């Protein structure tokens, strides 16, 4: 083993940017020995390849998360201080949770159960900011615009419509959006009139641009303090929330 470590360490030193002295270089025979020892070790312990791949993926995710956190800091005002964004929960919150969501996203439907539960448990301490982020087709975009238009009729109207839309599965053609809006207590005629306001479509476009800046490639996507949680990972969401509440 000592011979193996000595040869292997020399091999790594040779591969570095600084060349070692000539008398420290490996001979051809030593190089062959290193290759054979490494080969035999891998053949006898093939699981090390899987371990290496897992570690490689972990490091890649860490780099991606760090890059996204840097982007979050750069886009702080657009994320947290846009008055156009719908909000739910505490007016003076201890914790703010941001969710990028799409009404056609089945995982958003799962995550909505956690959102509702948190609002029931910590509605006086937690505030949600919803980023309407339609990425699943034209009907997703129409539903997002409809929800933002309905918000002009009141935050409670928006909340009812938001959860009605998110619980609906399948396609969202115009007729179905209107039906769901009516069920949620929305004045559909007024909603449709407000949907023609360029300010609302501009808001949706701005959120899309923000999502691209943050490299949000799927929904749901949560920002909880310094923790980014892609997907409907209930355990990760709850852990991040508890860290913020108890931090």
Residue spans for each PLM region:
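A short beta-strand-turn-helix
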Residues: 78-95, 120, 208
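C-terminal cap of thioredoxin/glutaredoxin-like
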Residues: 4-5, 24-36, 179-247
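Structural alpha/beta surface segment adjacent to cysteine/selenocysteine redox centers
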Residues: 98, 103, 109-182, 212-217
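Bacterial signal peptide processing site
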Residues: 18-20
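Hydrophobic face of amphipathic alpha-helices
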Residues: 22-53, 57
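Soluble non-cytosolic domains of exported or imported proteins
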Residues: 28-32, 43, 106-109, 137-141, ...
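Bacterial N-terminal signal peptides
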Residues: 6-16
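N-terminal "domain-start" segment that seeds a small globular fold
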Residues: 63-87
């Amino acid at each position: 083993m000592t011979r193996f470590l000595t040869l292997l360490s020399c091999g790594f030193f040779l591969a570095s940017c600084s060349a070692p002295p000539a008398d420290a270089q490996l001979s051809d025979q030593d190089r062959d020995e290193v290759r054979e020892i490494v080969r035999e070790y891998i053949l006898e312990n093939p699981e090390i390849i899987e371990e290496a791949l897992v570690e490689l993926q972990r490091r890649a995710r860490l780099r991606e998360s760090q890059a996204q956190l840097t982007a979050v800091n750069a886009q702080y005002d657009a994320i947290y201080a846009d008055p156009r964004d719908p909000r739910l929960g505490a007016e003076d919150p201890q914790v703010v949770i941001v969710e990028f969501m799409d009404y056609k996203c089945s995982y958003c439907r799962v995550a909505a159960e956690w959102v509702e539960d948190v609002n029931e448990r910590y509605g006086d301490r937690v505030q949600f900011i919803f980023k309407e982020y339609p990425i699943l087709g034209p009907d997703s975009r129409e539903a997002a615009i409809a929800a933002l238009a309905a918000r002009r009729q009141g935050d409670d109207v928006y909340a009812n419509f938001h959860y009605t839309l998110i619980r609906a599965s399948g396609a969202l053609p115009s007729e179905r959006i209107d039906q769901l809006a009516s069920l949620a207590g929305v004045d559909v005629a007024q909603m449709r009139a407000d949907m023609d306001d360029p300010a609302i479509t501009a808001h949706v476009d701005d959120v899309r641009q923000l999502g691209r800046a943050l490299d949000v490639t799927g929904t749901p996507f949560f920002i909880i303090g310094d923790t980014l949680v892609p997907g409907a990972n209930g355990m990760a969401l709850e852990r991040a929330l508890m860290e913020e509440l108890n931090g």
